[in-house]
Amino acid sequence: MERIKHAATNSSLDRDGMAAVVDMYATWCGYLRRCAMDPNASDESVDLADSGLVAALEAVQVWGERRFGSAFQGDPNYRLERIMIYHLTEKHGAIDEAREHWDKLAQKELLAHDYSFWLSYYMWEMNLLQSQKGTGRSPTPAPAARLSRTPSRPASILQRALQVSQLNWPERVIEIYVKHCNDFESSDVLQNALDEVHNLQRVIAQRRKDATAAQTAQAEAHARAYESQALEASAAAAEAQALGKQQTGDPQDDLNAGVKRKWEAIASGETPESATKKPKNEDIGVNAAAPNSDQKSQENQPAKRDRENTSVFVSNLPSDVTITKVRQYFREYGHVNNIQLKHEENGKSTVALVEFRSVEDAQTALIRDGKYFGDHTISVKEAAGITLYVTNFPPSTDDESLHRLFGKSSNIFGIRWPSLKYNAHRRFCYVSFRDAESAAKATGLHGKMLEGKYKLSVQYSDPAAKKAREGATDEGREVHIKNIPQEFDEKEIEQLVSKYGTVKRVRLLHNMAGRSRGSAFVDLETKDEAERVVAELDKVKLGTQILKVELSVSAKFKPSARETSVASESATCNGGQEAPDEAKGEAGNEARGNLHLRSFALLGIPDTVNITRVRSLAEPHGHITKLKLYPEHGGAIIEYEDETTAGKAQLALDSTQLEGHTLRVDAVPQLFKEKSGVRIDRVDIAKRRPPKPTADTTSATMGKKAAPTTAPALLPAFVRRPVLGGKGVKHGLGFSAISATTSTKKDGQPTATNGAATSSTSSDTAPKKSNADFRALFLAGKSSTDSKEKVSEEKSKASGAPASVDKPDSKPDDTKMEIDVVVNGH
């Protein structure tokens, strides 16, 4: 037994905590106590128990402090201490030493807050008194002077328990305390106990009342927070809907380059007036009624996913393992949200990143560390601290660029890009590493400058952390100036605004011809300077225009991204001189006329690809004058400078692969009929199967509306089949007459009958044969038959074979032949 105990102490029992360590030592101490309590036990067994119990208590304490530090408070069930106390009491009678162990346990908060510990201490004292004294009204007699002030030892234990303010069940201790004083103590002690209990009950009642009030206040605060969030969400939804209506236009109207549209103003940063209008009373009523429903929906929604703290790494899996097998393996340890598999470089094993629903499920799954998965011994480790939030990198960055940035030896497990459906200007990603050391090393790139103007941000991912938006627009440092004269450029605008603050950047909007649109965005150094610019320049006359200056408002709903290229060649002519108005008008009309030939839709683009990457894909095939990305529809509209370039680009881009998706080229109106694919990054949600192709879907894909299916259309077709013995005119054995007449066109040619075209033959136009013609044909056939018979007889005579027996002449009567021809037609 001792050898087994030593082998157990040398193993990693504390891998999953101290539970296994305490269980092992409790079993060992129980064995020592039973050996010592045996009536026939030797002195060696008793000495072994004395030393073994003390050594076990010290070993558990040292082991726990080494594992958890000062936070270790011992076994909540104090199993080793109880074995030690009963050993001292029953075997040695060392009551004072046993009480010292009880007092040490009472000093630990973990046990001092538990009423069951104090009841166990009380029962030990009562059993001890009953065993030491057989008679007497009171188990602890005392002088009369001490009866009114000093309670007995068991009562003092209960009184000491009632002094703990965080006792989990004080009512139970009060009940036993009053019962003990009523049964064993004097009247003075009982009266003092009742007074003490009365005061204590008042304190407990007030404490419970304060706790209830605090809970009620907390619940009301949460309700107000939910209500404010619901109001903000409804207001944001209304604003997004208004912006979406203004941004969404007729796709066909988008092809007219000469017409200004509101959604172009939104894409360039301008805020339409309708977005700043107050909602109507009906909208306010709807939004006011929304919080209750939103609050209920938020309560019913599951908790937010926390991939960073609910995932584990499972390594050394078989190379042919599947997601289903891994999910079945961990199913009994918790709910699995998602599983990602990646083959090792050697190709002999696979590593999996398993995401659970809660942190407790992930901790439970660690039990499988070192266990078998088939014939492989797997390793299960925590995946905390391996995911980094990376942002502010160049817009053209992709997976390959990130691998080069962090280095090939960075041990990257996967990269997760956000969806651009509702904000096409997002530029961040999540990078997961194989271990925490690699992630910590990658954070050293935080603050690195890329391409001379992008300051990289690399931080640990924390779903609970919220960061205020940065930038001139979100910080209130950007002003929007409208109605600027056409002859003003960016330098003149900067000189105008610099009188009221420090200008950081000026962005003047241009049209397709490169001319000013009379609108600009100016970034200043502080918010106060921006407000001063608005106060000083708003409604000021500049040249012949009245300026309109206001603070820029960022649009939260950005379902598309737009880029244009200034066509300088079309805007100027005659060696750099500006073209006359007549030339500009003719060029504009020509451009609008062939716009549909220069534009096309590129479909099948993933919703994680931004507009810069689409441009880098399409720009090698020619100069792009306009590009607009629609992540919600999974495509983009590309406009080239001429028809030839657009045609070559369509041939080159069709069937191109982009991140595992096959791109295809189609007309622009088809883009707005497409929907971007739904990404499901969970294994606990069944993926939708694509519908089977039917007649309705086929007609819909061809751009035609399918006719609605009605009940008569579902009936089987009625087929007429010929039946022997049916009624009708009996014809002869020859050819039957054609009942259906052939309809002819105006030029005399036959038309289609029953859907099949009837071809004109010589029999259609040839005259009909008479009886004389049939008679001549018959006689000609008979003469040819007689000549053949003579030739066969001559051959048989030459070969010596017997001649064939001639049959009697059965020449038909000519008159009968004529009758048959007239009646039967042959």
From Swiss-Prot:
GO terms for molecular function: RNA binding. Residues 310-385, 386-463, 477-554, 598-670 form the RRM domain. Disulfide bonds: none annotated. The keyword RNA-binding applies. The keyword Cell cycle does not apply. Transmembrane segments: none annotated. Gene3D superfamilies: 3.30.70.330. Signal peptide: none annotated. It comes from the Eukaryota. Coiled coil: none annotated. It is found in: Nucleus. Keywords: mRNA processing, mRNA splicing, Nucleus, Repeat, RNA-binding. Functions as a recycling factor of the spliceosome, a machinery that forms on each precursor-messenger RNA (pre-mRNA) and catalyzes the removal of introns. Chaperones the re-annealing of U4 and U6 snRNAs (small nuclear RNAs) released from previous rounds of splicing, an initial step in reforming the U4/U6-U5 tri-snRNP (small nuclear ribonucleoprotein) that can reassemble into another spliceosome complex; this step involves binding U6 and facilitating the unwinding of the U6 internal stem loop, followed by base-pairing of U6 to U4. This is U4/U6 snRNA-associated-splicing factor PRP24. It comes from Ophiostoma ulmi (Dutch elm disease fungus).
